[in-house]
């Protein structure tokens, strides 16, 4: 058995083509395109790279982006004031605060200051709560991207046992709730779970989101399972030992090229949706 490759890069490219048409139609109708505002506080090179990648994705689909750069010394109040300014700007349809922010800033307060209708990265507590309750809200970009990838490849979720290894507020926790809302039976584990192997051994779907290179071993995973690796570490490895699973899993996300492209794609996807709602 050769595992089906859940190709996030290919799906992201296909989606970008569709989004380009939607943006062009909106521009033809209104003379405007959606605008994503990205906020970068400080000079962290990795964060700057991520912000640039998001801006490039906007450019590829013909959508505008607004880059807001603030100094490392920015205070919580100063960042809150900038977010309020963007909330009140009718030309801005999505707001992304690049994580992490400098330690003197209350990141949670700043995330929660983002207007719900512009929370296209799915980081507010209100958005998380609405998502958990099955109400309309933009999902956290990575888990929402995973759900879109599973849907595109018609991976059945209803009644399946999904084990999510990881509990971060922007990945593990929302991932578990999205799977639950799709009628999967969900077990949440993490790096301190006792006898982790026994939980994973029963899983129809395994999601690695623990942030430790190849923490989840291939021989823990049962034949025919669907394997989703949301990790990425130097050397091109994820959170799961993927090599031996090529002929054991029924489907898997490659690293790189699986989950990663879907994260930025989902941010752009939700930004276009927000723009359509506000401009159409």
Swiss-Prot record:
Catalyzed reaction equations: (6R)-5,10-methylene-5,6,7,8-tetrahydrofolate + NADP(+) = (6R)-5,10-methenyltetrahydrofolate + NADPH; (6R)-5,10-methenyltetrahydrofolate + H2O = (6R)-10-formyltetrahydrofolate + H(+)
Binding residues for NADP(+): 166-168, 191
CDD domains according to UniProt: NAD_bind_m-THF_DH_Cyclohyd (cd01080)
Signal peptide: none
Alphabetic keyword roster: Amino-acid biosynthesis, Histidine biosynthesis, Hydrolase, Methionine biosynthesis, Multifunctional enzyme, NADP, One-carbon metabolism, Oxidoreductase, Purine biosynthesis
Record GO terms (molecular function): methenyltetrahydrofolate cyclohydrolase activity; methylenetetrahydrofolate dehydrogenase (NADP+) activity
Family matches, as PROSITE patterns: THF_DHG_CYH_2
NADP listed as a keyword: yes
Pathway(s) where this gene product acts: One-carbon metabolism; tetrahydrofolate interconversion
EC number from the UniProt entry: 1.5.1.5, 3.5.4.9
GO BP, one annotated term: tetrahydrofolate interconversion
GO cellular component terms listed in the entry, alphabetical order: cytosol
SUPFAM superfamilies associated with the record: Aminoacid dehydrogenase-like, N-terminal domain (SSF53223), NAD(P)-binding Rossmann-fold domains (SSF51735)
Function: Catalyzes the oxidation of 5,10-methylenetetrahydrofolate to 5,10-methenyltetrahydrofolate and then the hydrolysis of 5,10-methenyltetrahydrofolate to 10-formyltetrahydrofolate.
Protein family: Belongs to the tetrahydrofolate dehydrogenase/cyclohydrolase family.
NCBIfam families linked: PRK14192.1
Subunit structure: Homodimer.
PANTHER family: C-1-TETRAHYDROFOLATE SYNTHASE, CYTOPLASMIC, C-1-TETRAHYDROFOLATE SYNTHASE, CYTOPLASMIC-RELATED
Record's protein name: Bifunctional protein FolD
Upper classification of the organism: Bacteria, Pseudomonadati, Pseudomonadota, Gammaproteobacteria, Cellvibrionales
